[in-house]
Regions:
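N-terminal amphipathic/basic leader segments beginning at the initiator methionine
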Residues: 1-30, 308
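Short glycine/serine/threonine-rich phosphate/pyrophosphate-binding segments
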Residues: 19-22, 42-47, 87-90, 208, ...
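N-terminal small/polar loop signature for handling phosphorylated ligands or for N-terminal nucleophile
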Residues: 28, 32, 38-59, 71, ...
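A glycine/threonine-rich phosphate-anchoring loop and its flanking beta-alpha core
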Residues: 55-154
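Short alpha-helical scaffolding segments that buttress acidic/His motifs in well-ordered protein cores
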Residues: 138-142, 183-194, 231, 266, ...
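Active-site segments that bind and position negatively charged phosphate/pyrophosphate groups
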Residues: 144, 148-265
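C-terminal charged capping/lid subdomain of soluble metabolic enzymes
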Residues: 246, 256-323
Length: 323
């Protein structure tokens, strides 16, 4: 298992020449009764979509995005995780890029019946992708925690523990990328952040994810790295709207006293990890220009349950602050 070759993939494509055509080749002619995803989040998401599309003659994208209907039957599937961070093995959601429409969005698909998480399977994943994936985990926990819910929610306590543990183990990997125990802890952090437990009894704020999804649709940038660029700017815009929660975040995750200090501690941690902090540092298929960021702001989903709903102009402004 340790000898497989890591191949980077940023997205799962939907549209002409992508998932639908591969599905026809992979499923229709062979009569499979189960699927096994072996890889990271993109591989697992692709199999989730294939497992859902295999059981309907309708176009899955149109069915969900236009008709707002969801699959009622899916092909059974399982997952062997070789690159952690997304938590894709723990739920029925899948993030899909439709290149024809320039939309990157979440869809309801198949949920794995089982998942195998062995940190030794991740040892050939390169340092930057491990850290980028772990930041996605941290983002999942943060975006759940900062949703506009009541204080003293038990799910918040669990989220803060996952954030703190993720930071601790990312720092361990910065010292020793082959620390199997740290990789194992991060695999479990990833699973816990997206298995639904943190979302019990609360609403969530995934505005940073919505911005990054559309940024990825236009640029093909790495998901975790795009989040690393966006999060500090976004939190500087909303910190005063959830000051008590940011203060607790700063104290319990980074050991600082004030809400603003918590945001800046997060920004410093991103630099410590060697993650990108500006749009120009992202690996992109095109130059990231103000025009692209305007398109991102105009087309991303706007979340109404974050501490304060943002206007599209404010989203554009904060994205420009990342240039």
């Amino acid at each position: 298992m340790q000898k497989f070759v890591y191949e980077y993939a940023t997205k799962v494509n939907f549209g002409a020449g992508a998932v639908k055509e591969h599905l026809a080749q992979a499923v229709s002619g062979y009569g499979q009764n189960v699927m096994l995803a072996y890889g990271g989040g993109s591989v697992i998401d692709c199999c989730k979509i294939v497992a859902a599309q295999a059981k309907t003659e309708e176009d899955l994208w149109e069915m969900e995005m236009t008709e707002h209907k969801f699959p009622t039957e899916v092909l059974p599937m399982g997952a062997i995780v070789t690159a952690s961070g997304t938590g894709a093995e723990m739920n029925g959601g899948a993030v899909i890029t439709n290149e024809e429409k320039v939309i990157k969005a979440g869809m309801a698909a198949a949920a794995p019946r089982f998942a195998i998480l062995d940190p030794e399977y991740t040892l050939s994943v390169p340092r930057m992708q491990v850290i980028s994936g772990a930041f996605d985990t941290l983002s999942h926990a943060m975006e759940t925690y900062f949703g506009n819910s009541d204080q003293d929610n038990v799910s918040d306590d669990v989220a803060l523990s996952i954030m703190r543990n993720t930071v601790v183990n990312m720092r361990r990997l910065l010292k020793d990328i082959n620390d199997v125990q740290a990789r194992g802890n991060l695999m479990w952090d990833s699973a816990m952040a997206e298995n639904g437990i943190l979302k019990v009894g609360r609403v969530t704020d995934f505005q940073a994810h919505q911005m990054e999804h559309q940024l990825g649709a236009y640029t093909d940038c790495n998901h975790g790295q795009g989040l690393a660029v966006i999060h500090p700017a976004y939190y500087r815009h909303i910190v005063k709207d959830a000051e008590e929660k940011f203060q607790r975040f700063g104290k319990e995750v980074f050991g600082v006293d004030s809400a603003q200090a918590g945001v800046e501690a997060l920004a410093d941690f991103i630099k410590e990890c060697g993650l990108p902090t500006k749009m120009g540092e992202l690996k992109s298929k095109v130059e990231i220009t103000p025009e692209i960021l305007r398109n991102v702001a105009d087309t991303c989903n706007v979340i109404k349950c974050n501490p304060r709903e943002l206007s599209r102009d404010e989203i554009y402004d904060l994205l420009m602050e990342c240039m």
